[in-house]
């Protein structure tokens, strides 16, 4: 239904990181995604080099009062699949978002993202619904561009300045650990070290 192409001032792996956790929703997406999702909870599974996260929608709150037979995963969650090395796939009820990040061959601090929004054909038969769904796809792509990637470009500038020697991923960021350890393993590098804390 829609396709957007963004040239972004951040490395493609940093772009993938933006899809790796949800606790930033209340700060970065306070007027957008935070209104639709609980940012402090998710389900996470790995499948070899790939992974799946289930982002918890606020609509799940209303399911508590329904029998389990009426629960619907696409009402309660948004599944997000990372397909190694550069694809984010987000299926919903009759829709699908596909985000692919491509490195810039000349400039490692830049990349191109292609954001596609697919919709089942029967949904598009109603012209009014088609326009609503089209707006949903456009809005989601703009959130990626204007919120996530804007922050990623800032992080890229910090990384290039040399002021920050390393980043620490928290225990609540399993997807980020998985992304980077998968990349490192494929490059023949040691896995990220785990920091020990006194109480563990």
Model-predicted segments: where are they?
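C-terminal catalytic domain of Rieske-type non-heme iron oxygenases
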Residues: 1-200
């Amino acid at each position: 239904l829609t396709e957007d192409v963004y040239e972004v001032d951040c490395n493609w792996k940093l772009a993938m990181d933006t899809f790796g956790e949800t606790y930033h929703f209340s700060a970065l997406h306070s007027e957008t995604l935070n209104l639709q999702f609980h940012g402090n909870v998710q389900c996470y599974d790995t499948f070899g080099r790939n992974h799946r996260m289930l982002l918890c929608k606020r609509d799940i709150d209303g399911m508590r009062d329904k029998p389990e037979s009426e629960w619907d995963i696409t009402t309660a969650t948004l599944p997000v699949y990372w397909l190694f090395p550069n694809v984010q796939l987000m299926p919903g009820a009759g829709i699908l978002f596909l985000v692919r990040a491509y490195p810039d061959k000349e400039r490692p601090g830049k990349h191109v993202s292609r954001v596609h929004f697919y919709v089942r054909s029967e949904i598009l038969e109603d012209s009014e619904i088609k326009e609503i769904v089209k707006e949903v796809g456009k809005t989601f792509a703009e959130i990626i561009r204007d919120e996530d990637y804007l922050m990623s470009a800032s992080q890229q500038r910090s990384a290039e300045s040399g002021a920050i020697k390393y980043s620490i991923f928290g225990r609540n960021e399993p997807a980020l650990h998985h992304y980077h350890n998968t990349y490192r393993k494929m490059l023949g590098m040691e896995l990220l070290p785990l920091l020990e804390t006194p109480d563990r």
